[in-house]
Amino acid sequence: MSVMMDTILNLGLNDKIVVEIHTKIGNERFAYDSYRRFIIQMFGDIVMEVPYADFEKVLQGIKDKVGVKLDNELKIKDFKEVIAGYKKLINKKKRHEFPQDVQERLKQAIHVIFGNNPMAITYIFINDIPHTRGIAVNIVAKVFSNMGDTSVSGFAFTPNPATGEKAFFGDI
């Protein structure tokens, strides 16, 4: 996961796949938390350009309603309500539903990176990358860091992508 570019995790999740994950793994909280947090909120913000703060308002409204402070205190029914709220928000702001077709979502995400993405343009400018070289889109399988207390993920680079220093750089 690059610290320099937008990241959309779990692009392949949709209403059907989230049920399959819950069924196969046996962890409904993980499935629905991943769906609301990574795909709807990230994709909605980065690709569909619905402000991240608007998603946070939906989430905070539900946390206030059920009387909790932290996301991990929400129950599964609350996560499902958050997901419904996020979808309603997207429909209201964009006048169409959150896309369930994973291939269509992938195309939209790639278009954002290769399109007029301000973060990509800034990255190209700062690193003096010629327009003839362009940028890349990485599509990889993800290690889940939110499956429980024994899960973690991270990233590592050499050289440091922020400074160019020839040293190890990473985070978990």
PLM segments and residue spans:
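Nucleotide/phosphate-binding sheet-loop regions of phosphoryl- and nucleotidyl-transfer enzymes
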Residues: 1-172
